[in-house]
Regions:
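Catalytic active-site module of serine/aspartate enzymes centered on a nucleophile-bearing elbow/loop
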Residues: 431-494
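Conserved acidic catalytic loop of the alpha/beta-hydrolase fold
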Residues: 217-222, 232-250, 263
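Short beta-strand/loop motif that positions the catalytic acidic residue
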Residues: 409, 415-417, 421
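Short, surface-exposed "cap/lid" segments of acyl-processing enzymes
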Residues: 131-135, 139-218
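Gly/Ala-rich beta-loop-alpha elbow adjacent to hydrolase catalytic centers
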Residues: 253-262
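Alpha/beta-hydrolase-fold enzymes
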Residues: 2, 10-111, 247-248, 261-376
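Active-site nucleophile elbow and catalytic-triad environment of alpha/beta-hydrolase enzymes
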Residues: 381-405
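Conserved alpha/beta-hydrolase "acid-adjacent" motif
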Residues: 422-428
Length: 494
């Protein structure tokens, strides 16, 4: 007991440090979420005044909100119970170590000091998020990238190899990476310096690799007014540019919403002369199979729009991001996020590394507004399924888009999905396959992990993007980089 009394000033100081750091961390998470919620409330009030919901719609919203609140509360209670139990166990052990003067174990003062250090690391983690800025994603202002072309809506940058001794090979098919409008482009670059970049995994094999970047929607009126037809027309222009430069048809490589848009553009027949290969990563081909999103109440688009100073309306990125957080509210509510960060700091001995900081930066800093017509198109794909004859629920240039036309258009489709993806579930990503009669058109590949695993860990030993691997079902698969190289080799023989 004398040992505890002797260390009491240190224990009290550590307790105060712990409490202050916990308060800072929880306040930061609450403030970040509340900011998005206040923006959502402001938009909803304006929409309710101009175009009010029906009583039935209002009741559905209230019921959905109740379900979200219940899910968040349940997750918080479960997480907090586990955390408190672990803390009591460790504190009790430290207490008895102190009483018995056990020098081999941690005493109360050491336990409290360690907990305070961990909590301060959590509270100060935003510093790591800011510090990773110059390493995260594409740094288009550097010599590692070249502006290849520009349209009203898009910038096309070439991604140059970072691997020593590798040069761009003109004998390989060129590729355009198409990110989703909503999540931004930088997740495709992630951490090039750490060899964790999906884009550079292609470039470092000598593949002529390009990335399509949406211009700043806040300053570019053409972007604000972009619709799916515009996207297709301008994508054709980009492909024509690369075909003229490299002498081969282009591979479109789309991620998430970007993959769906690439599929639409190809099925329209507009790209027949310039594109013959499609790669999609975790693309929501039939959003009705994603219960997390399709199960959300349907509201008219006034409830997601923001009016810019020039009078144009766009889909608010903060509101759409908040909707995605609600989908995963059991992991995304403020208390659970703080407790998860505590567990991470403990597991990594307060050194979680650059990957975690980069992921947080992507989630917090990459929210952008969307062209309203693009948002409407995406919304429709989660509300209406592919028809019984294979037609997508959306059209281009007023014409239907049938997935079975891929074979007629001579397009090969490499389609991958994430086994543990709860946003774009495997059935959601593979829904079109049953309608495609030619079994040589689609190559369907399962990857371990969640929604962005292939982007943040492209060289995972279990499923390297540039090699072959065996899935849990015993089937041998190849990664998308290997697929692109093989397709290039096949094309060269013709």
């Amino acid at each position: 007991m004398q040992a505890i009394l002797k260390d009491l000033p240190d224990i009290a100081t550590s307790w105060l440090r712990y409490t202050l750091a916990l308060t800072r961390a929880t306040n930061r998470e609450h403030a970040e979420m509340n900011d998005s919620m206040m923006i959502a409330a402001q938009i909803a009030l304006q929409a309710a005044r101009d175009n009010p919901m029906s009583l039935m719609e209002t009741m559905e919203i209230l019921q959905h909100n109740q379900e979200i609140a219940g899910k968040a509360t349940s997750a918080s209670q479960e997480k907090l119970t586990g955390y408190v139990y672990d803390q009591i166990q460790e504190a009790t052990q430290a207490f008895f170590n102190t009483l018995s003067n056990n020098t081999e174990g941690e005493n109360v003062a050491g336990f409290m000091r360690r907990e305070a250090d961990i909590m301060e690391s959590v509270a100060n983690f935003h510093e790591q998020i800011e510090k990773i800025k110059d390493e995260f994603g594409f740094q288009f202002h550097t010599s590692g990238y070249k502006l290849a072309h520009e349209t009203d809506t898009f910038l096309l940058y070439q991604v140059l190899p970072t691997k020593s001794g590798v040069k761009v090979r003109d004998d390989l098919k060129p590729m355009i990476l198409v990110p989703p409008y909503m999540l931004g482009v930088h997740i495709l670059g992630f951490l090039p310096g750490e060899n964790k970049s999906y884009a550079h995994s292609f470039a470092n094999e000598g593949i002529p690799t390009y990335v399509r970047v949406v211009k700043d929607i806040m300053t570019n009126e053409a972007v604000q007014k972009t619709n799916p037809d515009d996207d297709c027309t301008q994508t054709k222009e980009l492909c024509e540019k690369l075909k003229a430069k490299h002498g081969q048809k282009v591979t479109l490589n789309g991620t998430c919403q970007g993959g769906y848009i690439c599929l639409m553009n190809i099925l329209s027949g507009t790209l027949t002369d310039v594109c013959d290969t499609l790669i999609t990563n975790v693309a929501p081909i039939d959003g009705t199979y994603s219960e997390a999103i399709s199960g959300m109440p349907q509201m008219h688009h006034d409830f997601i729009t923001t009016t810019l100073p020039n009078g144009n309306k766009v889909a608010n990125g903060y509101l759409l991001s908040l909707g995605m957080r609600f989908v995963a509210i059991d992991r995304e509510n403020p208390l659970v996020k703080v407790l998860d960060q505590i567990s991470l700091q403990k597991a990594t001995e307060q050194n979680p590394g650059k990957t975690v900081a980069a992921l947080f930066r992507w989630l917090l800093k990459e929210r952008v507004h969307l062209p309203l017509e693009i948002a409407k198109m995406s919304s429709l794909t989660f509300q209406q399924p592919i028809s019984i004859n294979g037609d997508l629920p959306v059209q281009l240039y007023g014409k239907p888009l049938n997935v079975n036309d891929l074979g007629k258009l001579g397009v090969k489709w490499y389609q991958n999905y994430a086994i543990k993806d709860d946003l774009v579930t495997p059935p959601c990503a593979t829904a079109a396959n049953r309608y495609i009669k030619d079994n040589k058109v689609v190559e369907c590949v399962p990857f371990p992990g969640g929604h962005v695993a292939i982007l943040t860990s492209p060289y995972n030993k279990k499923s390297p993007v540039n090699g072959e691997f065996t899935g849990k079902d015993g089937t041998k698969y190849r990664g998308p980089v290997k697929f692109q190289l093989d397709v290039s080799a096949t094309t060269a023989k013709k």
